[in-house]
Regions:
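Short, Lys/Arg-rich, polar N-terminal cytosolic tail immediately upstream
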Residues: 1-12
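Interfacial segments of alpha-helical transmembrane regions
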Residues: 10-17, 85-98, 154-163
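Alpha-helical transmembrane segments of multi-pass membrane proteins
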Residues: 21-39
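Membrane-interface interhelical loops and short amphipathic "cap" helices
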Residues: 39-54, 114-123
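Interfacial helix-start motif at the membrane-water boundary
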Residues: 48-68
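Internal transmembrane alpha-helix with an interfacial aromatic "cap," most often the third helix
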Residues: 65-92, 139-149
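Aromatic-anchored segments of alpha-helical transmembrane domains
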Residues: 99-106, 164-168
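Membrane-proximal helix-loop-helix units in multi-pass membrane proteins
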Residues: 103-146
Length: 168
């Protein structure tokens, strides 16, 4: 029996997407407990990780695996899709990975300075990062949906991309 180490490694690293999901979900669910008066219907999730948020420490602890796991997972998907799939599918995946990098770097470098929007340069860069992340998310997911519509081999990718886009 021969084990494909490269393929197995890529597949196992792909499972870090689940770790990222659980880490981010824990941060979103439990960080409000450390933020008196936080209203999830009226406030952005970014308020939980603002530079002066009372929940910042808990947010950082719970989300510590999110960025690294997301980036490794996305990069492994890029490595695994090379030379495979349609051009539209690959472009969608590459743009989604670019979005993950912009998210990881942009939001780490420029957390909100204060809950809400204080209008500082840091806040402006946070908003700019958000705009880029949202645009890349929409474009990449639409491309993956199109790939799923055009080729039934990628229909499941398209369906999950549609669900993700709908949840946005």
């Amino acid at each position: 029996m021969v084990i494909n180490m490269k393929g197995d490694f890529i597949n196992y690293c792909g499972l870090l997407g689940i770790v990222a999901f659980l880490s981010y979900t824990a941060a979103v669910v439990f960080s409000p407990l450390a933020y008196p008066g936080y209203n999830w219907m009226a406030q952005a999730v970014s308020d939980l990780s603002a530079a002066n948020a009372p929940s910042l420490r808990l947010w950082n602890q719970l989300s510590c695996l999110y960025n690294v796991s997301t980036l490794v997972c996305a990069m492994m998907v890029c490595a695994g899709i090379q030379g495979k799939g349609s051009r539209i599918l690959r472009l969608g995946i590459y743009l989604f990975t670019a979005m993950e990098w912009v998210s990881a770097v942009g939001f780490s470098m420029f957390p909100l300075s204060d809950s809400g929007y204080a209008g500082t340069f840091q806040d402006q860069m946070h908003i700019f990062s958000t705009i880029i992340v949202v645009l890349l998310s929409i474009i990449s997911l639409v491309l993956i949906i199109i790939a799923g519509i055009k080729d039934k081999e990628y229909r499941l990718y398209g369906a999950f991309a549609g669900i993700a886009l709908g949840m946005m």
